[in-house]
């Protein structure tokens, strides 16, 4: 496996659902890259998953990765729940469809390319990487809000 990359991800939403943004900070050696994006009508959980997905898509080769997220939903979903979802054809134990299955499936497809350790970090608790990812997610959310204002 290749180089070590540290990634911090976050999602933000104005309302749930509502306009939302995602952000990620990727750190490799002494360099870093910030990325963010938005959706005009989404949920906070979709933005959390999208942040991780888009960060992984930025990587051009196999890497050893530590991903830090303040979303228990993302961290638990990708490390614990997803195995049963796959076994149950993307249904939960009560036979209801898994929410956000489209994004979970895309994220799962990215996992095989890398060695990944998923870590939960408390949000808004003076972790510089998490703070940076949060700012990027808010930037995405604010972009979505401005676009919606322009549309009237």
Swiss-Prot record:
<dbReference type="GO" id="GO:0043137">
    <property type="term" value="P:DNA replication, removal of RNA primer"/>
</dbReference>
<feature type="binding site">
    <location>
        <position position="10"/>
    </location>
    <ligand>
        <name>Mg(2+) 2</name>
    </ligand>
</feature>
<keyword id="KW-0479">Metal-binding</keyword>
<feature type="binding site">
    <location>
        <position position="10"/>
    </location>
    <ligand>
        <name>Mg(2+) 1</name>
    </ligand>
</feature>
<feature type="domain" description="RNase H type-1">
    <location>
        <begin position="1"/>
        <end position="142"/>
    </location>
</feature>
<keyword id="KW-0378">Hydrolase</keyword>
<keyword id="KW-0963">Cytoplasm</keyword>
<keyword id="KW-0540">Nuclease</keyword>
<feature type="binding site">
    <location>
        <position position="48"/>
    </location>
    <ligand>
        <name>Mg(2+) 1</name>
    </ligand>
</feature>
<protein>
    <recommendedName>
        <fullName>Ribonuclease H</fullName>
        <ecNumber>3.1.26.4</ecNumber>
    </recommendedName>
</protein>
<dbReference type="GO" id="GO:0000287">
    <property type="term" value="F:magnesium ion binding"/>
</dbReference>
<dbReference type="Pfam" id="PF00075">
    <property type="entry name" value="RNase_H"/>
</dbReference>
<comment type="similarity">
    <text>Belongs to the RNase H family.</text>
</comment>
<dbReference type="GO" id="GO:0005737">
    <property type="term" value="C:cytoplasm"/>
</dbReference>
<dbReference type="GO" id="GO:0003676">
    <property type="term" value="F:nucleic acid binding"/>
</dbReference>
<comment type="function">
    <text>Endonuclease that specifically degrades the RNA of RNA-DNA hybrids.</text>
</comment>
<feature type="binding site">
    <location>
        <position position="134"/>
    </location>
    <ligand>
        <name>Mg(2+) 2</name>
    </ligand>
</feature>
<dbReference type="InterPro" id="IPR050092">
    <property type="entry name" value="RNase_H"/>
</dbReference>
<dbReference type="InterPro" id="IPR002156">
    <property type="entry name" value="RNaseH_domain"/>
</dbReference>
<dbReference type="InterPro" id="IPR022892">
    <property type="entry name" value="RNaseHI"/>
</dbReference>
<keyword id="KW-0255">Endonuclease</keyword>
<keyword id="KW-0460">Magnesium</keyword>
<feature type="binding site">
    <location>
        <position position="70"/>
    </location>
    <ligand>
        <name>Mg(2+) 1</name>
    </ligand>
</feature>
<comment type="subunit">
    <text>Monomer.</text>
</comment>
<dbReference type="InterPro" id="IPR036397">
    <property type="entry name" value="RNaseH_sf"/>
</dbReference>
<dbReference type="GO" id="GO:0004523">
    <property type="term" value="F:RNA-DNA hybrid ribonuclease activity"/>
</dbReference>
<dbReference type="InterPro" id="IPR012337">
    <property type="entry name" value="RNaseH-like_sf"/>
</dbReference>
